[in-house]
Design a protein with these regions (language model features):
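A structural signal for short, well-ordered beta-strand segments
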Residues: 101-104, 140-142, 213-217
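Catalytic core of non-heme Fe(II) oxygenases with the double-stranded beta-helix
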Residues: 111-184
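Short hydrophobic-aromatic micro-motifs
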Residues: 32, 142, 191-193
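Short coil/turn motifs at secondary-structure junctions
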Residues: 106, 145-147, 200, 220
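A conserved hydrophobic position in a structured secondary element of the catalytic/binding core
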Residues: 81, 157, 193
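Catalytic core of Fe(II)/2-oxoglutarate
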Residues: 170-221
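Short edge-strand/loop segments of extracellular domains
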Residues: 107, 157-163, 216-221
């Protein structure tokens, strides 16, 4: 982490519904704490331990598995159809929402971090395909481990999805940004983002792995 990085460690549980909606609409990110309890996290970790994963093209220490929605069971009950998450998404987007993607990711010790990027690319891309071209999408990132400063915490550039500047080209990637923010969170929480905001994560310089379930939803309209 850069020594100049800000840390957003506010009490997210104190936000009202209106404040949560404003946070993700204007700032581009939001934390919903305590969506999964300790037993649910343990059950999901037992499941993920059985999955075969692939390494990303930039690091053997970053592993992933796509299309986890087809595993059903716990993934559907605890994650995809999590009632508290859906309640918020319905308030944000309307009653009808569509799941666009569901991915598992594990950042192991030695993971170099992910550069600042967007998941929203209006003409599609080889990485995100047509899903990235949806004009509105919310990414919901469930963390099965604590997001601490040394184990790949989330990073984001607030309000970057609002910029018209050429530097906000959604196909760009950046190593760092002077206004980037580190967002810690406890296991069982989810970070929600506007898919057009620039975000990534910091390196894993700790001794443990960090597991995440990343879902994408868009309003049906």
């Amino acid at each position: 982490m850069s020594s100049t990085s800000l840390i957003d460690d506010r009490d997210w549980s104190s936000l009202t519904l209106g404040e949560r909606i404003r946070q993700i609409e204007v700032e581009g990110y939001l934390v919903l704490p305590g969506l999964l309890d300790a037993q649910q996290i343990a059950d999901l970790k037992t499941l993920t331990a059985t999955w075969e994963t692939q390494a990303t093209d930039y690091s053997e220490s970053q592993r992933f598995r796509q299309n986890i929605e087809f595993d059903g069971g716990l993934i559907n009950d605890l994650v995809i159809a999590n009632p508290r998450t859906l309640e918020f998404l319905h308030a944000l987007c309307g009653r009808d929402i569509i799941l666009m993607s569901a991915i598992y990711a594990r950042s192991e010790p030695g993971h170099p971090g992910i550069s600042l990027h967007t998941d929203g690319q209006p003409y599609g891309s080889a990485i995100f395909g047509s899903a990235g071209s949806a004009p509105f999408m919310v990414r919901v990132l469930y963390y099965l481990d604590d997001l601490t400063p040394d184990i790949s915490p989330f990073r984001v550039v607030p309000r970057s999805h609002l910029s018209f500047h050429a530097d906000a080209n959604p196909y760009y990637r950046f190593d760092s940004h002077p206004e980037e923010v580190m967002v810690p969170a406890e296991a069982g929480s989810a970070v929600l983002i506007n898919h057009r905001v620039f975000h990534g994560n910091f390196p894993n310089v700790g001794s443990g792995s960090r597991e995440m379930l990343a879902l994408g939803y868009r309003p049906s309209w």
